[in-house]
Regions:
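Short, compositionally biased P/S/T/A/G/V-rich stretches that sit at domain boundaries
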Residues: 4-32
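Contiguous beta-strand segments within globular domains
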Residues: 32-45
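Extracellular Ig-like/FN3 beta-sandwich strand-entry sites
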Residues: 37, 92-94
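Short amphipathic, basic-aromatic surface patches that mediate peripheral association
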Residues: 43-53
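Short coil-to-beta strand junction motifs in C2/discoidin
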Residues: 53-59
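Short strand-edge motifs at loop-to-beta-strand transitions and within beta-strands
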Residues: 81-85
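Short acidic/polar inter-strand loop motif in beta-rich domains
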Residues: 100-110
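Short beta-strand edge segments in extracellular beta-sheet folds
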Residues: 112-116
Length: 116
């Protein structure tokens, strides 16, 4: 499901903590109406904030509807690594969020969404 740097684990980082800090969390309705705007919030990490420092930060997050890229948001260390996007869909799909940490690489999350 997600890229994971084994070398980092050998150096003492706990895999679970790394996942908690990196796997994006997609907050969106399970069901929406065709063609109607709704909000998708993405935050990086569950219950723990990822560092946003010059040497270690989330560089970007991308949102896909199946294989179609809906958005890409670039972050700087001055920002909080979360975003709210307003989108509309024409058919049911899997929303996927890919976030990229400059040290720990790419992490993915997915959420099924039904369009009526
Ligand atoms: Fe990281």
């Amino acid at each position: 499901m997600s890229y994971y740097d084994l070398k980092k684990a050998a150096n003492g980082d706990d895999k679970t903590t790394l996942e908690d800090k990196h796997v994006p969390v997609i907050d969106a309705p399970d069901k929406v109406k065709k063609g109607e705007y709704f909000e998708v919030k993405i935050k990086m990490g569950e219950g723990i904030d990822h560092p946003m420092e010059e040497k270690h930060f989330i560089q970007y997050v991308e949102l896909y509807a199946d294989y179609y890229q809906l958005a890409r948001v670039n972050f700087t260390p001055e920002m909080k690594a979360e975003v709210a996007l307003t989108i509309k869909l024409e058919e049911s799909c899997t929303l996927r969020a890919y976030e990229f940490c400059n040290i720990h690489g790419q992490w993915e999350a997915a959420k099924e969404i039904t369009v009526d």
